């Protein structure tokens, strides 16, 4: 019998100009199955050897920081979220760790509390809030104050183009400017404002237009993801709303009309043969916990 399992969706962040603020949960998943208690933590997985199998694993270390009193267990982790590709793999692990602590420690955390804790770990709310709440989220971190709003976007389809190459988030952030001119900040903020308003009003053509007019980060990251302009051009010709970097890259995130997502994905796959083209959906559920029996700490 499986006593406890946790499923956490992947996420994409930024959606163009919504830098470190806008996130969308996606239909790729990290699954954690909690097995029996043990003398020490053991993580069973089939990932690369660099991923720890003990209490240094990000899921376990997060859980132990949230609730140090929980007993060690054997857990089994599976995931179809690509690592270091801009699809929130580390955020999903952090969220899974928080939920693991919540369940094993009987913490009864609210969704808002989970977002607060996860943001403190991650440093920004976009990926973690999307994975916790599902759907599309807009978040702001101001000192210790975190505000998150969730909206539904069920009319949208999602395509992700995933390259074979990894791109470390720290490397992708290193190309960003340390300072931003005031007039550029005003322009970039205005575009981000219109993106959020269009998402709320379901004006998808405007969403697509604003996605492709970012000034905060994409112009500086083009050297790391040089295919973005050509993918953007093709996607628009094939009927997509808009294209942007997925998080820090290198994956590319495309919003489409829901009914056209398969057709557009097939067309893109014929052009960009060196990339994995994934037809995805927006996950609207967020964290899912299945319990067959109660486990205490």
Curated annotation (Swiss-Prot):
Its main location: cytoplasm. It is an enzyme of class 2 (transferase). Disulfide bonds: none annotated. Pathway: Amino-acid biosynthesis; L-threonine biosynthesis; L-threonine from L-aspartate: step 4/5. It catalyses: L-homoserine + ATP = O-phospho-L-homoserine + ADP + H(+). Its EC number is 2.7.1.39. GO terms for biological process: threonine biosynthetic process. It is found in: Cytoplasm. Keywords: Amino-acid biosynthesis, ATP-binding, Cytoplasm, Kinase, Nucleotide-binding, Threonine biosynthesis, Transferase. GO terms for cellular component: cytoplasm. ATP binds at residues 82-92. Belongs to the GHMP kinase family. Homoserine kinase subfamily. NCBIfam families: thrB (TIGR00191). This is Homoserine kinase.
């Amino acid at each position: 019998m499986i006593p406890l399992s946790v499923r956490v969706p992947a996420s994409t962040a930024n959606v163009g100009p919504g830098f470190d603020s806008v996130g969308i949960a996606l239909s790729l998943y990290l699954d954690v199955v909690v097995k029996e208690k043990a003398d020490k933590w053991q993580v069973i997985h089939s990932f690369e050897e660099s991923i720890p199998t003990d209490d240094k694993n990000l899921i376990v270390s997060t859980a132990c920081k949230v609730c140090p009193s929980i007993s060690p267990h054997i857990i089994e982790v599976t995931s179809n979220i690509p690592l270091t590709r801009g699809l929130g793999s580390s955020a999903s692990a952090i969220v899974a760790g928080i939920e693991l602590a919540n369940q094993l420690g009987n913490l009864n955390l609210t969704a808002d509390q989970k977002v607060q804790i996860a943001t403190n770990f991650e440093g920004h709310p976009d990926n973690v809030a999307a994975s916790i709440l599902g759907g599309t989220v807009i978040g702001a971190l101001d000192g210790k104050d975190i505000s998150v709003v969730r909206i539904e976007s069920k009319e949208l389809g999602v395509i992700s183009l995933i390259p074979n190459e990894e791109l470390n988030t720290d490397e992708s952030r290193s190309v960003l400017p340390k300072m931003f001119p005031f007039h550029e900040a005003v322009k970039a903020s205005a575009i981000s404002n219109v993106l959020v308003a269009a998402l709320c009003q379901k004006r998808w053509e405007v969403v697509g237009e604003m996605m492709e007019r970012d000034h905060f980060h994409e112009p500086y990251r083009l050297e790391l993801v040089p295919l973005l302009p050509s993918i953007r051009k093709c996607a628009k010709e094939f009927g997509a709303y808009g294209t942007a970097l997925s998080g820090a890259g290198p994956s590319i995130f495309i919003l489409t009309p829901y009914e056209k997502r398969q057709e557009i994905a097939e067309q893109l796959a014929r052009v960009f043969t060196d990339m994995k083209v994934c037809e995805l959906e927006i996950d609207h559920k967020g964290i899912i916990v299945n319990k067959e029996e109660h486990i205490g700490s």
